[in-house]
Amino acid sequence: MVTDQSPNNNGWPERYFAVIFTAQRSQSGDDIYDITTDRMVLLARRQPGFLGVELVRGDDGIGITVSYWVDRDAISNWRQQAEHMAAQALGRQEFYDWYRVRVAEVVAERAFIASNIVDAVHGTGDE
C-alpha cells in the first residue's frame, strides 16, 4: 500500500473530498502499468489541491485507489490534466476489465494509532 497521509492528517482542511477509484486489472499491459501508476501518483502530488493518496491491490487484481483533494475544482482539474487523460484512455484500452469512480465529501475522520484513538470529527459525530 502506498499512502501520503498521516494518521490524523495534520494540516488538512476540516472537510475535503475523496476520489475512490475501484478497478479490476486485465491480463494485459503489465509491463507499463506500474510505470504509469507511479507517474500518475507523481503528477497528482504536484497538482494544486492534492492532499494525499492510498493505493491497495488484492491478489484477485481488484484495486482501490483513494485520492484526497481540497475541493471539487481540484478534482476536476486533475481529471482534465493532459497526461492523466492519456493514462485514463490507456487504462480503458489495456489495464482494466472494469472500473468505477466515486467522489465523496469527507466530513469526519477517526484513526487508531498504537492504542490511542484520534478523533478528528469535523461534523456532529453521528455519521
Question: Can you describe what each PLM-predicted range is?
Answer:
Residues 89-91, 95-97:
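Short arginine-rich
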Residues 20, 87-90:
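Residues that form generic nucleotide/phosphate-binding pockets
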Residues 1-62, 72-80, 96-127:
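Short S/T/G/P-rich N-terminal loop/turn motif that feeds into the first structured element of a domain
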